[in-house]
Amino acid sequence: MAFVPVIPESYSHVLAEFESLDPLLSALRLDSSRLKCTSIAVSRKWLALGSSGGGLHLIQKEGWKHRLFLSHREGAISQVACCLHDDDYVAVATSQGLVVVWELNQERRGKPEQMYVSSEHKGRRVTALCWDTAILRVFVGDHAGKVSAIKLNTSKQAKAAAAFVMFPVQTITTVDSCVVQLDYLDGRLLISSLTRSFLCDTEREKFWKIGNKERDGEYGACFFPGRCSGGQQPLIYCARPGSRMWEVNFDGEVISTHQFKKLLSLPPLPVITLRSEPQYDHTAGSSQSLSFPKLLHLSEHCVLTWTERGIYIFIPQNVQVLLWSEVKDIQDVAVCRNELFCLHLNGKVSHLSLISVERCVERLLRRGLWNLAARTCCLFQNSVIASRARKTLTADKLEHLKSQLDHGTYNDLISQLEELILKFEPLDSACSSRRSSISSHESFSILDSGIYRIISSRRGSQSDEDSCSLHSQTLSEDERFKEFTSQQEEDLPDQCCGSHGNEDNVSHAPVMFETDKNETFLPFGIPLPFRSPSPLVSLQAVKESVSSFVRKTTEKIGTLHTSPDLKVRPELRGDEQSCEEDVSSDTCPKEEDTEEEKEVTSPPPEEDRFQELKVATAEAMTKLQDPLVLFESESLRMVLQEWLSHLEKTFAMKDFSGVSDTDNSSMKLNQDVLLVNESKKGILDEDNEKEKRDSLGNEESVDKTACECVRSPRESLDDLFQICSPCAIASGLRNDLAELTTLCLELNVLNSKIKSTSGHVDHTLQQYSPEILACQFLKKYFFLLNLKRAKESIKLSYSNSPSVWDTFIEGLKEMASSNPVYMEMEKGDLPTRLKLLDDEVPFDSPLLVVYATRLYEKFGESALRSLIKFFPSILPSDIIQLCHHHPAEFLAYLDSLVKSRPEDQRSSFLESLLQPESLRLDWLLLAVSLDAPPSTSTMDDEGYPRPHSHLLSWGYSQLILHLIKLPADFITKEKMTDICRSCGFWPGYLILCLELERRREAFTNIVYLNDMSLMEGDNGWIPETVEEWKLLLHLIQSKSTRPAPQESLNGSLSDGPSPINVENVALLLAKAMGPDRAWSLLQECGLALELSEKFTRTCDILRIAEKRQRALIQSMLEKCDRFLWSQQA
């Protein structure tokens, strides 16, 4: 693997292509030689693509869904413009010079409507379109220099009057040459032609020429909006020859000229794309003398332009080149916020994002693009090392990235990453370690016991008495979230284009500890890289830490430990690391530490207990290798139950408190999910009780106070979640524990006989139902479970027990609660939250279902429909559990999911979702029960179909028919038939009857439905034998003898489809068997006398037709015979 060159300059931003639009163009058939994309525009909601065939495709940016197609017969689409302040309007110009303004009517769910068609520029080439920023007005410029305005009226009365009284098209001006670009802001229209730029006050109808010097060629101009908060006036930037720009004030006066010629001599930055690996050439080129054909305002500080060679982004106020990259053959560019949509000369469209380097790497990491992320880090080393980037790209993330790369393939890349990590964090910076949560504005001293005394350097601290809370030992969740969000705000696209010199503006204020007792604190457990010398010292540290609550001292005692084996799983990314590390946040002292001690002490009893679990785990894993155990369910359950007893003994709530206290009292408090204000109250209450117990000389009471102050051993079992491990677990052992614990859940081995310290057998857990046992198992061993396997097991084994699913979701919520993305999901509307979910959460994250749950709780069914884009990360089986209280909403999701596939793929797609097969009947029963007509409309009192009831509207008829037509075994088909009959879904019932060869039942129900169309046409059910015809005629006779005629749905026999009676069936019989055989069969059934003259005439016509047909056939045969004989002669 070649060595990746390092870009010497510290570039803060890069252009990145995270997704390709080629599949979209292919689906729209805009990638052929006959039809291609000719124009492009973008707004907050839409991506508009004009085609050479005159069609305008409107694609919803959320999910890239094709929503509308607007056709034009006046030629190819040459220009498109979306109204930025109202997404419901779009303007297009055709190759013939017509301008059409459309109202999309998306909010009212109506059909798009042509608001106005302007022929003002007919016969000319429209070169520019621009919308007013406040009202519905479109400015149009053509190649002859004419500029006009189309003012729209939205009310119906105004539309009607416009044709007779008003003149919606107004000629603004005619400039001396072709209009290159139009831009509008705050009542001013900016016109750039081939020779100069003009500023027009459209309200007062005044015009100014910008500058005195003319130019010759295509040069753009754009407005540069000022900052509203700072009262800054908008500016204008006009392109000039030789890579120059004029900076112009809002009155049209040239302020200064900016020269970018020498700045553009630097090599181009690579575009980060999945199509190829980024390449960088250090060779500096000569200065570029360019003409900028258009200027576009991008984000907040930047101006974008392009040439045939590449894309250039400037910060004109600072006379800086933010970046330039080689992107070939660009025809046009549309921008929205920090997004660029580039239309190329061959009709292709590329989607680029202007993004900071650190955020680019983060997005690549979330998508699992390890090679590309590593190369980007190595290319932009100077940017990654910058202080601002280090807050986002921590060394832990770089270590995790390195662990994902294959040593054989990416050896050079791994060595470069290692060098980067060394630069990122020097080895001797102990107090600034990447795993330390102590603020750099705090100092600490080491006491004789090995405890670190943290000394805050903040000013204006509160009283000593208030500073003694548990929260003072760790950073609060709120403060960490504020720090994180401040980093995120720095990376917002709209503010990402600041100058290079602005990186030092990051706030470095010291962390302030909240100490108000009445405030609710959220404990936030995070490992610290400080270890005391031995377990005994660590125990003494806990005692002193607990005593500090009673004495109300001002010292902050930290006894938190980091894991000696901290290592992230390879498959985990981003924020998932916090929940599924190979070693949990809290650790036990390492054996090496005890060996270093000169004082020989006997190991505490908890180590023996943990050693016992290791032996039991190794023994259980060995037994699982035996096929006689692995494939025999009873033997497997016995092995798991025996092992589970050791696990319960080790992690028992009562007996394991000593381990927790020995490790870290405050970290143990942080692992359990409790109401924090209650935990604080418990701390103060237990402090008072501890003082009383001290008078009895009970030394152990001090050791247990930190744990018992928050919970009781067994009474609060139902309220606790063990999210993270209470002590350090080696990587190999943790994997074995996870495998066995998950296997216990899958095989429903959820408890065993536990012997307490008093020696008796505890049967309390065995008295509960399986659902309660499963919930308790999840809460106790959540930190050991394989979350993906656990989720699937719960869906299969406890599909009818919503409490188990709810418990699992609660555990995931607790895991995600410390994630800033989870906090951010509480803000904004549904599209904003969906975009955040799409950008920030990996699709393979087990926490994805939690975010989906939050969206559903907030937005209901609309959120479910939006979750279709996350399939297959979120499956229908997840959704049905998520909304088990509202099955109708699940059915709406399932119907939308199936309809999102092409028509010819829906059946196979639905079949792939039916795992297990039992879901078929469940979903069918749900579909025929919801949004269905009342049973009184489909069946009579005897259970037979009412006439024409098969024509009633069913909300999910297409989904039902898809389910029915899928292949299945005989028993399943019979059950589906019974479901359709009991619910009165007669179209499906008839299909299933004919599949099961229950033709007698089918014809019986067809007669009751009284619709001849069921027996006509290519898909009609026509009797195949004489016996079936006799049966059908007999059924009609029986029906006609009933005392009251069956009324149609409309209440009249004359309305609706043709009824099934003797004459209509006789006519069908005559057409199928011939008039003579039909007559004889009718006579045999005694129905010949009931026929009218119409039947007789029809039979006569059929006889004549048959005679002519026979004659024609005979004639053709004779001609063929003569022809063949002539050929032989």
Curated annotation (Swiss-Prot):
<dbReference type="GO" id="GO:0007596">
    <property type="term" value="P:blood coagulation"/>
</dbReference>
<keyword id="KW-0225">Disease variant</keyword>
<dbReference type="InterPro" id="IPR015943">
    <property type="entry name" value="WD40/YVTN_repeat-like_dom_sf"/>
</dbReference>
<dbReference type="InterPro" id="IPR056499">
    <property type="entry name" value="Beta-prop_HPS5-like"/>
</dbReference>
<dbReference type="GO" id="GO:0060155">
    <property type="term" value="P:platelet dense granule organization"/>
</dbReference>
<keyword id="KW-0963">Cytoplasm</keyword>
<feature type="region of interest" description="Disordered">
    <location>
        <begin position="561"/>
        <end position="609"/>
    </location>
</feature>
<feature type="region of interest" description="Disordered">
    <location>
        <begin position="483"/>
        <end position="503"/>
    </location>
</feature>
<comment type="similarity">
    <text>Belongs to the HPS5 family.</text>
</comment>
<protein>
    <recommendedName>
        <fullName>BLOC-2 complex member HPS5</fullName>
    </recommendedName>
</protein>
<dbReference type="Pfam" id="PF23756">
    <property type="entry name" value="Beta-prop_HPS5"/>
</dbReference>
<dbReference type="GO" id="GO:0005829">
    <property type="term" value="C:cytosol"/>
</dbReference>
<dbReference type="Pfam" id="PF23758">
    <property type="entry name" value="TPR_HPS5"/>
</dbReference>
<dbReference type="GO" id="GO:0005769">
    <property type="term" value="C:early endosome"/>
</dbReference>
<feature type="modified residue" description="Phosphoserine">
    <location>
        <position position="695"/>
    </location>
</feature>
<dbReference type="GO" id="GO:0031084">
    <property type="term" value="C:BLOC-2 complex"/>
</dbReference>
<keyword id="KW-0015">Albinism</keyword>
<comment type="subunit">
    <text>Component of the biogenesis of lysosome-related organelles complex-2 (or BLOC2) composed of HPS3, HPS5 and HPS6. Interacts with HPS6. Interacts with HPS3. May interact with all alpha-integrin chains that have an aromatic residue before the first lysine of the conserved KXGFFKR motif, including ITGA2, ITGA3, ITGA5 and ITGA6.</text>
</comment>
<dbReference type="GO" id="GO:0005737">
    <property type="term" value="C:cytoplasm"/>
</dbReference>
<dbReference type="GO" id="GO:1903232">
    <property type="term" value="P:melanosome assembly"/>
</dbReference>
<feature type="modified residue" description="Phosphoserine">
    <location>
        <position position="532"/>
    </location>
</feature>
<dbReference type="InterPro" id="IPR035431">
    <property type="entry name" value="HPS5"/>
</dbReference>
<feature type="compositionally biased region" description="Basic and acidic residues">
    <location>
        <begin position="564"/>
        <end position="576"/>
    </location>
</feature>
<dbReference type="InterPro" id="IPR056445">
    <property type="entry name" value="TPR_HPS5"/>
</dbReference>
<comment type="function">
    <text>May regulate the synthesis and function of lysosomes and of highly specialized organelles, such as melanosomes and platelet dense granules. Regulates intracellular vesicular trafficking in fibroblasts. May be involved in the regulation of general functions of integrins.</text>
</comment>
<dbReference type="InterPro" id="IPR036322">
    <property type="entry name" value="WD40_repeat_dom_sf"/>
</dbReference>
<feature type="modified residue" description="Phosphoserine">
    <location>
        <position position="534"/>
    </location>
</feature>
<keyword id="KW-0363">Hermansky-Pudlak syndrome</keyword>
<dbReference type="GO" id="GO:0046907">
    <property type="term" value="P:intracellular transport"/>
</dbReference>
<dbReference type="GO" id="GO:0048066">
    <property type="term" value="P:developmental pigmentation"/>
</dbReference>
<keyword id="KW-0597">Phosphoprotein</keyword>
